[in-house]
Design a protein with these regions (language model features):
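Feature recognizes metal-dependent phosphohydrolase scaffolds
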Residues: 2-682
Length: 682
């Protein structure tokens, strides 16, 4: 009897504790009751959520360093780094020839481009109908496989309104008491007969790609020298589930969109150096007319050999006039940029970049520049807008050009949309499902400890430094116009681009001036942060993970630095704790690395690294059914299939179930009045 009494006391205390918690949360639960006005509504969601927890984890796709290379990005996005082809092979196997499976995979990647080619091979109406039937049935089977990780409700929400009901029937029909072939045959036959086959094929292909990857992670550098970063951002804005970790090329564009003059000059210098300014003018509507006029006025007759843009034969041809126009603007904007760098360095002594004000270190009589303790001859000695007595002072014409450029960047509606998206979906780092994602580095000392940096009177290191960088970067865009906080944030966006201890840059200096003006290659060296030595050490990687609250079995996903595979370098560091996935999209790096980079796929069963070969063109990929996956390396295989309940999303869902159970209890206690519905079973 005594034991039973003790159990009753424990039960009463437990009930009191649960009741107290409900009472404490009553204000929140009352708000929650607006969405779930009855016990029936809350209980229904509890049941569906608990079922969702038992589904397999969705596939995550990691990409990095896109560098504006839109065609390669689109191909890897469409193919999900080989996931789509794996699903095609899994469903069709050896029953369908390899070349037919390759064609079907290409159709899924590029339905609008591939469909006309495949139809053109059909020599009769009967042959076309037969091809339609085979293709639709195969696509339905593949779509059923990729939808198996999702609830039926989720799949329905992904279906296009115009044909959603029919696709739902095709994907979820049951055949216990009727003939599957007869049922499918009737629906598919009707689709073909009514001239809707093309539309259904395209919709199925898009649905397969949507369902095959649950989450896309972009680990930085959407912008750089590639031709169309705007296309990449347009696609990402339409993606169903994406996050972004800013790279140094991204933050400088974010600063430019905020109207920061030094960031504007920096992005212009990069685009002009690679003859990509057409994208600025045509896609973002940036007016370069005033810059071109000033450039011709002051530099039109100069020797522009060191200012000629890097060109890509695949994007040519280029006329002499085109190259001259680009080179003269390249020189004008570079000198303006070097002047503005002096201003930013003066305003921010805590950046510790005082040695980078090179215009002040030029001997105007000897035509040399002092770098460190040595003097070097200048490759170009024409500085008509520079006053030797005050080299950083802006010429009146430069001031006018700068005002017009700031106005143009601020008024570019598309650029503002893209940068707002980068802020909304982006951050300096991201943690999800046991993976720590960041673009560049966690700055370290030569001894392998976290580097301590002082900003605005306080010291930061490790995670605190990354959090500080994120917060100050947001000031540059969102702080009130004209405020000191906004100016400080914009200066910091430039620091994140090239600062010696920037976690997004990870090098001692951005040697832009030296590469342009100094012949001696020893001055061009950009010393990597000690992080890039220490990340080979497993203990250091585990310490980084611990700094961010993750257990040692977690992973770091890093971008930024191309892996020179042809020299034997491995993308797997720190005993498998860190993976470098620089996407290698930038064509300039292919000769150095021997490959076109890596992507990462994390499914419910494995984490795998995908190695890519250089991508020629979308046209060739469509025509010849080319893919660029050359190798798949399994990094980890799970002992059991990872379920939604094992993920970060699962934790959120369990909290929702807990809250809904409390709401049901509050209804039962009479503390919240429910709105009863006619049709319920509770």
């Amino acid at each position: 009897m005594a034991d039973c009494g003790g159990e009753n006391v424990v039960m009463e205390e437990t009930m009191r504790t649960e009741t107290d918690e409900i009472r404490d949360n009553l204000k929140y639960l009352t708000l929650l009751s607006r969405d779930y006005p009855s016990q029936a509504a809350a209980a229904s969601d509890i049941i569906s959520t608990q079922a969702l927890l038992k589904l397999p984890k969705g596939t995550e796709h990691f990409m990095s360093d896109l560098h504006g290379e839109n065609e390669a990005f689109v191909h890897i996005l469409n193919s999900a780094s080989g996931v789509i082809r794996e699903k095609v092979d899994q469903v069709l196997g050896d029953t369908v020839p390899k070349h037919t499976r390759a064609e079907l995979a290409t159709l899924i990647y590029y339905p609008n481009e591939k469909l006309p080619q495949l139809k053109a091979r059909c020599t009769s109406e009967e042959a076309l109908d037969q091809w339609y039937t085979e293709t639709l049935l195969r696509l339905i089977d593949i779509c059923r496989l990729v939808s198996s990780k999702h609830t039926r409700d989720h799949v329905r929400r992904c279906l296009p309104a115009s044909c959603g009901y029919i696709l739902d029937e095709l994907l979820h029909a049951h055949f216990e008491d009727h003939d599957k072939d007869l049922y499918y045959g009737q629906i598919v036959g009707s689709i073909i007969e009514n001239g809707r086959a093309d539309r259904f094929i395209v919709r199925l292909c898009e649905l397969i790609k949507h369902l095959a990857v649950d989450k896309l992670h972009i680990v930085g550098d959407l912008f750089d020298r590639g031709p169309r970063p705007d296309i990449i951002l347009d696609l990402l804005m339409r993606h169903h589930n994406v996050d972004i970790q800013w790279g140094n090329h991204d933050v400088v564009w974010m600063g430019a969109a905020a109207g920061n003059p030094i960031c504007i000059c920096t992005v212009l210098k990069t685009t002009l150096a690679y003859h990509n300014h057409g994208m600025l003018e045509d896609c973002y509507g940036i007016n370069l007319r005033h810059l071109q006029r000033m450039a011709e006025q002051f530099y039109g007759n100069d020797d522009l050999s060191i200012w000629m843009p890097h060109t890509d034969a695949a994007r040519g041809p280029y006329t002499r006039g085109m190259l001259h126009r680009c080179a003269v603007m390249h020189k004008a904007i570079s000198i303006l940029m070097f002047k503005l760098e002096c201003h930013v360095i003066d305003r921010n002594p805590d950046f510790q970049m005082q040695e980078r004000d090179y215009l002040r270190r030029i001997d105007w009589e000897k035509h040399t520049v002092k770098i460190g303790e040595k003097e070097y001859p200048l490759r170009d000695t024409s500085f008509p807008t520079v006053d030797p007595a005050d080299p950083a002072a802006l010429h009146p014409d430069e001031q006018l050009v700068l005002r017009k450029l700031v106005q143009s960047f601020r008024q570019s509606e598309k650029l503002q949309q893209h940068v707002e998206f980068l802020y909304a979906k982006g951050s300096v780092y991201h943690i999800e499902n046991g993976n720590l994602l960041y673009h560049g580095a966690v700055p370290m000392t030569s001894r392998g400890t976290f580097a301590m940096e002082r900003f605005e009177g306080r010291y930061y290191s490790g995670r605190a430094l990354m959090d500080y960088c994120d917060a100050r970067a947001r000031r540059g865009y969102y702080a009130p116009e004209g405020s000191a906080a906004r100016q400080s944030g914009q200066d910091f966006l430039w620091y994140l681009w090239c600062g010696k201890l920037s976690p997004l840059f990870g090098r001692s200096a951005m040697t832009t001036f030296e590469r342009l003006y100094v012949e001696d290659a020893s001055t061009h060296t950009e010393v990597k942060d000690p992080y890039y030595t220490w990340y080979n050490d497993e203990a250091v990687c585990r310490r980084i993970l611990a700094e961010f609250g993750l257990p040692g079995a977690s992973h770091i996903v890093n971008g930024h630095v191309p892996v020179r595979e042809k020299n034997g370098e491995s993308p797997i560091k720190g005993g498998g704790r860190l993976v470098v996935i620089d996407g290698g999209f930038c064509r300039a790096y292919h000769e150095k690395t021997g490959i076109a980079g890596y992507t990462l796929v994390y499914s419910s069963r494995t984490m795998s690294l995908r190695t890519h070969q250089p991508f020629e063109s979308a046209e060739k990929a469509v025509k010849d059914n080319l893919d660029i996956i050359s190798q798949k390396n399994i990094l980890e295989t799970e002992n059991h299939r990872i379920l939604v309940e094992d993920t970060d999303e699962g934790e959120v869902l369990r909290e929702r179930v807990h809250d809904l159970k409390q709401l049901v209890a509050a209804y039962q206690l009479g503390w919240i009045t429910e709105t009863r519905c006619e049709d319920h079973i509770w």
